Amino acid sequence: MTDYSKTVNLLESPFPMRGNLAKREPAWLKSWYEQKRYQKLREIAKGRPKFILHDGPPYANGDIHIGHAVNKILKDIIIRSKTQAGFDAPYVPGWDCHGLPIEVMVEKLHGKDMPKARFRELCREYAAEQIARQKKDFIRLGVLGDWDNPYLTMDFKTEADTVRMLGEIYKSGYLYRGAKPVQFCLDCGSSLAEAEVEYKDKVSPAIDVGYPFKDTAALATAFGLAGIEGKAFAVIWTTTPWTLPASQAVSAGADVVYQLIDTPTGKLVLAKDLAEDALKRYGFSDGIAILAETTGDKLENLHMNHPFLERDIPMLNGEHVTTDAGTGLVHTAPAHGLEDYAVCNKYGIELYNPVNAEGKYIGETPRVAGMRVWEANSVILQWLEETGNLLASSKIEHSYAHCWRHKTPLIYRATGQWFVGMDKAGADGKTLRDKAIKAVDDTEFFPSWGRARLEAMIEGRPDWVVSRQRYWGTPMTFFVHKETGELHPNSAELLEKVAQRIEEKGIEAWFSLDKGELLSAEDCEHYDKLSDTMDVWFDSGSTHYSVLKQREELDWPADLYLEGSDQHRGWFQSSMLTGCASSMGRAPYKQLLTHGFVVDQNGRKMSKSIGNVVAPQEVYNEFGADILRLWAASTDYSGELAISKEILKRVTESYRRIRNTLSFLFANLSDFNPIEDAVQQADMVEIDRYALVLARRLQERVAGDFYPRYAFHFAVKEMVSFCSEDLGAFYLDILKDRLYTTKADSRARRSAQTALYHITRSLVLLIAPILCFTGEEAWDIIGGGAEDSVLFHTWHEFPTINEKAEAELVKKWTAIREAREAVTAAIEPLRADKTVGSSLQAEAEITAPEEMAGYLNALGEELRFALLVSKAEVKVGSELAVAAKASDGEKCERCWHYTRDVGAVAGHETVCKRCAENVGGEGETRHYA
């Protein structure tokens, strides 16, 4: 008796269904590194059009977190997909190495008591250690790049080029020195950039303070009155009592309507829109009378006394005054507020700053001298009560600026700093703000709402404070006049000479420089070296110059910058400003892509205290890096990205669907040689040609649309759907019979294998940018072997088909698929009540509209294969309907179809006539399915 199980083409897959990624990925990485895959790719891609994604440098401190992983994975998907699209897409990773966090860590580890040169040396060593740790994790994620030659902002050449960028901005005319209020962290002991500020709720005292008018006759005139009896006060409201010792004016809104109100305390000047609420705060309900009204422009240049100091206080008109809250009059301390500074500057009032860098009042400040500003609030309230000028006091919770490192409240404090001016006309007569806004217009944004966000930030941002009073940073290599504070007239030439020295010896070349080496004896008497360092955002914001313009394999401007959405305030902006303020005169990127932050499954931020932190190291050690990559790609990164063990398990199911599909495809290609066995498209079975159209259209959507516009979640959805719906639930389901039961080298089977070969190559190429490990594992089988890489190849080329023929083919098989779904639905009740097990136990009678019936009947005897039933009949009717019943045929031992011809061929008593022919004869012929 024949063992028919040995006559079917059931082949083992060289691609296991279990990926075992966590264990196998490290070995693949080692192999790729030994083969110098990245270097080979650069050779292969030479001469192609370039695509430059410039890496925003992560800070060299601490292990990478899940946000870092998302960022690097998204970048890697883009680099890989652009490479496969035919671009030369080098990736040079970088690190941000200077700055306060490293100083803090080095102080913790080694203390503060050491020479500054030794301190900087330890900072450099610490940064290098952190980079090595982070690099290992980034490589483990499968991120492809020039890891042996990354850029570091502490590299001597990069430090030198950062100095040169400073020179570019100096020559452009945007750099200036000024004593201006800046966000100041008392814990850092330094000014902060916009990007280093975060906002949190804070409880502050909220007080109403009366400033006594000096000349009530002048006040009466302003209100159109003949005179005023008794005391009169301009009432301000503030949440920062500690700034009152620096109060130098009161500001009124020129167009705001003010009332003069008689109260038991005296005459009060309040904004009309806020007077009612203010009087309630003061406890006045009886004995009040509105005496007159006027506008703020009439109050200009009236004078008051300071509420507790002997100081004349003028009334100014300020555009920043609103009637949103308070009293409509604003106490104005130019040392502690940008708007205050601006209005006092307009009136020629010289800035007075009573607070030093430690946040303490200087010695000449009565009562609070030597006291830190936060401690002074209660003393100042007591002082106001004593003078009788405190009208109300309460507490208020409001959003307040905090240091992003120390999480402590900031103060505005006027210090001598170097600024890049936003509204200062440069050497070309244009302001940096105008240039930057134009640069926003010239940039493409993903997602599109990034444009409005960045534009609003550029429009509202203050001048950029680029100087810092720190030790571990790129120095501002200027010589400054001892008396005037002016820069040396030959600053541009001197700066280049210093840059050349830094290029050889690093920043220590400046710190150890004797000024006599570069200046004449006379100049040495009048000029000193500037001791300030640069804002680290200037370092990273200059990398388009220090990296893109300096490395041969790169290009300027970059095609794309990709970072988290917080970088609208950070790197995107600092890069844009250095680009626009330099001789380049534009943003250093053509496109900006932003991704959201990672949260847990409940939308909460990652927090050690909550215990919801998901570390990338844990994910790749348990699931494999490809699962983490698939999660990042399948999540819509334009919003928050949710992650948890449960979410990762769901992602694993999607991965399994793709992997199982590939395993099936490879099993059925294991005896196929595309050179010897491929069937010409014209000779292929019709459904195979249809499957090729589906696969090509998938490639057109994924490679031609989703990858180019960075819509990776759509790409994943389409590829998983293709594997489960087009292949798993339709084409491969139908194909199994032909693959397993027809002769091994028959046209029917080789046609199917030809289609599978094209589908597999295309699918492997499509998944490879996302599933880089799985893609390479699969390419080892279908590509050129272990030394080959999927990245050495561009998107698959499908056999061409006439447009009209394709349209007709798709129309026909779309109708057949609709009929098949109806047949499957009709059989379901029979399966539910155990009348049949598999659909092959059923027969179907289909009623269909004329066109669909024509398509179905055109398949003839092969219709049953397309519908996965043992028998199918079709008749014409007005609408689609199916009647299904159990077959009365006998089951074929070999193909499992139920037919009435089992045993019809002598010697093959347990199989159908078709199987007997496939085993002992020339084999069946297929045309359609």
Curated annotation (Swiss-Prot):
UniProt KW Aminoacyl-tRNA synthetase keyword: yes
EC nos: 6.1.1.5
PROSITE patterns hit by this protein: AA_TRNA_LIGASE_I
Keywords (A to Z) from UniProt: Aminoacyl-tRNA synthetase, ATP-binding, Cytoplasm, Ligase, Metal-binding, Nucleotide-binding, Protein biosynthesis, Zinc
Any one GO MF annotation of this record: isoleucine-tRNA ligase activity
Classification via Pfam families: Anticodon_1, tRNA-synt_1, zf-FPG_IleRS
Residues where ATP binds: K608
Cell compartments where the protein resides: Cytoplasm
An annotated GO cellular component: cytosol
Motif 'HIGH' region location, chain numbering: 58-68
Cofactor binding notes: Binds 1 zinc ion per subunit.
Ligase in keyword set: yes
Cofactor section: Zn(2+)
Binding positions for L-isoleucyl-5'-AMP per the UniProt entry: E563
Family: Belongs to the class-I aminoacyl-tRNA synthetase family. IleS type 1 subfamily.
Subunit structure: Monomer.
GO biological process: isoleucyl-tRNA aminoacylation
Name this protein carries in UniProt: Isoleucine--tRNA ligase
Swiss-Prot/TrEMBL domain comment: IleRS has two distinct active sites: one for aminoacylation and one for editing. The misactivated valine is translocated from the active site to the editing site, which sterically excludes the correctly activated isoleucine. The single editing site contains two valyl binding pockets, one specific for each substrate (Val-AMP or Val-tRNA(Ile)).
Reaction(s) this enzyme catalyzes, per UniProt: tRNA(Ile) + L-isoleucine + ATP = L-isoleucyl-tRNA(Ile) + AMP + diphosphate
Transmembrane segments: none
